[in-house]
Structure formats: structure tokens, C-alpha cells
Amino acid sequence: MLVTFRPCGPKDHKVLLRLIIAYYRFDKIPFKRESLSRGLDTLLRNLSQGQAWMLETHHNKAIGYAILTYNFDLEYGGVEGMLTDLYVEKRFRQRGVGSLALYEIEDFCRERGIRTIELQVQHHNKSADTFYRSTGFRVLPRKVMILAVRPEEKRPLRRPIAGTRL
């Protein structure tokens, strides 16, 4: 089976969104369609944020996608790639499609001086965990934490008064 791996642009929004929703449902990731669509639009129109790719058969049928965004981390010497999504439709898995995507993404990063690629795997997704480990990813001894930025009035903490002894 011949598979192509090509960069996406704004014209790919509809197909990519369909694949992203399929991936989020498969991996049990909660989502709001409007939020995904808005974020995807931003990514596809602003390549300084990252890059999306489409995985297609030789008949131009979309069978998966990948999204790499950029993060800055001193620990890794500057810009690192964050592989936020890599999805291959079920009937095309175990055929080297994911490996092709990772190979191309690693080349993309190397060409841009990005020395590290980070990703997250859902605890229940054992096949993804096994796949990524087999390609050289390693588990860090850390927890992932996130904070959704809230409006000022909904914050549980109040701003400390400058000059006060804590």
C-alpha cells in the first residue's frame, strides 16, 4: 500500500476535523467541536504555531493525520516539538503508517533544529504506548498537569498585595 504524508493547509480543515473527532472519540478525549474547529483553523493559518500533516492512500483518501506544535523548554535546549496528535484509521494500523509519520516528523524537526519531540499517551491506550516505546520514546518520571486559564472572578486565589510579608 502506498501512503503519502503531506503538509496540510486551510483547505484541509473539514477532512482534518473529521479525523480529529474520530481520534478523540477513539481515545476517549473529551472535546467541544467548536473549540477543536477554532484551534485547527488557527494552526492551519499560522505555521509559526506548528504543522499538520495528512496521511493519504494513493487514491488521495485520508486515512490519518499528525499534528506537531512548538513549545520552548530550557531543559531541552530551546524549541521542542509537541506531537499532540497522531491518528491512523483502524483498518490501516499495523501496516507501518504510524512509523512513516514518525519518520517524516523526526526529519521535519531535525531540519529545523528541533532536538526533542514530546507526546502524551492516554493510560488506557496500551497499543499506542507500546508503539511509541518501540520507536524510541521513553517515559519521564513526571505527571502532566494543566490549568485552564479562568476569568479573574473565578480564580480561587487572590493576588498577593505587593510589599506584604508572606
Describe the function of each predicted region.
Residues P7-K14, R18-G78, T84, L102, ...:
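Acetyl-CoA-dependent GNAT
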Residues N71, E89, Q122:
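Residue-level recognition of the GNAT/N-acetyltransferase active site
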Residues V79, R95, R112-R115:
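Short coil/turn segments at alpha/beta junctions that flank glycine-rich nucleotide-binding fingerprints
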Residues V88, Q94-D107, T130-S134:
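Conserved acetyl-CoA-binding loop-helix of GNAT-fold acetyltransferases
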Residues L102, C109-Q120:
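Conserved GNAT acetyl-CoA-binding A-motif
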Residues L119-A128, I146-R150:
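Conserved beta-strand-loop-alpha-helix junction that forms the acyl-donor binding cleft
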Residues R133-R142:
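Conserved acetyl-CoA-binding loop of GNAT-fold acetyltransferases
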